[in-house]
Amino acid sequence: MQNQRIRIRLKAFDHKLIDQSTAEIVETAKRTGAQVRGPIPLPTRKERFTILVSPHVNKDARDQYEIRTHKRLIDIVEPTEKTVDALMKLDLAAGVDVQISLG
């Protein structure tokens, strides 16, 4: 797997969960002898929703809600076979979306 790179993108609503998962991935990759770049924090996406509280009148009465999507990027440079096997066996939290691409 020389001259290869594994790029891992993580997404989660909870920043503590995504930081914990990133730490696990980085620790696993370093333990197997791969060089790690990151974790790189990507911009947080904030979705805001405004909802009318009253069903009929009172346009001024509104509630506002927000969902934040936190993102991290990890590059694993020159991964070994042990690195790939260890990453495949890694069990991450349920609230974290993981996208892996080889480049």
UniProtKB/Swiss-Prot annotation:
Q: Which SUPFAM superfamilies match?
A: Ribosomal protein S10 (SSF54999)
Against InterPro entries, the record matches this protein to:
Ribosomal_uS10 (IPR001848), Ribosomal_uS10_CS (IPR018268), Ribosomal_uS10_dom (IPR027486), Ribosomal_uS10_dom_sf (IPR036838)
Keywords for this entry?
Answer: Ribonucleoprotein, Ribosomal protein
Pfam families in alphabetical order: Ribosomal_S10
Describe the subunit structure.
Answer: Part of the 30S ribosomal subunit.
Name the HAMAP family for this protein. Ribosomal_uS10
Q: Which protein are we looking at?
A: Small ribosomal subunit protein uS10
